Amino acid sequence: MTRRNDKSNPRLAELIRLLKQTSRENEVEIWSDIASRLEKSRKNYAEVNVSKINRYAQEGETLIVPGKVLGSGVVEAGVTVAALSFSDAAVSKITEAKGQCISIEQLLSQNPKGSRTRILR
């Protein structure tokens, strides 16, 4: 018998369901990819420092982090970052650089097609 992989966090379970539904409705693979990453064990979630965001992002770009954004390093580009959660230091550094920190749910409602977004892990 296999064990069901249900998430005990109701917000996360609803987010995964919403990501899969939006992926099917809009025929976009990016949301199903994010959902499959969030369905995995929590120890496999992405933990991205703002220095990595600074290294790979250009001004005005939208990035998705299927995990947590941490505050180590500096960010110079004003980017929009959507993630499952943010540390307090990461939020302050991104907003100081004229960027935005939004939840994955907000990005999903703003951009259901997932156009011009990149996954960072």
UniProtKB/Swiss-Prot annotation:
GO terms for molecular function: RNA binding; structural constituent of ribosome. InterPro entries: Ribosomal_eL18, Ribosomal_eL18_arc, Ribosomal_uL15/eL18, Ribosomal_uL15/eL18_sf. The keyword Nucleus does not apply. One of its GO terms (cellular component) is cytosolic large ribosomal subunit. Keywords: Ribonucleoprotein, Ribosomal protein. The keyword Ribonucleoprotein applies. GO terms for biological process: translation. HAMAP family: Ribosomal_eL18 (MF_00329). Belongs to the eukaryotic ribosomal protein eL18 family. This is Large ribosomal subunit protein eL18. The gene is rpl18e.
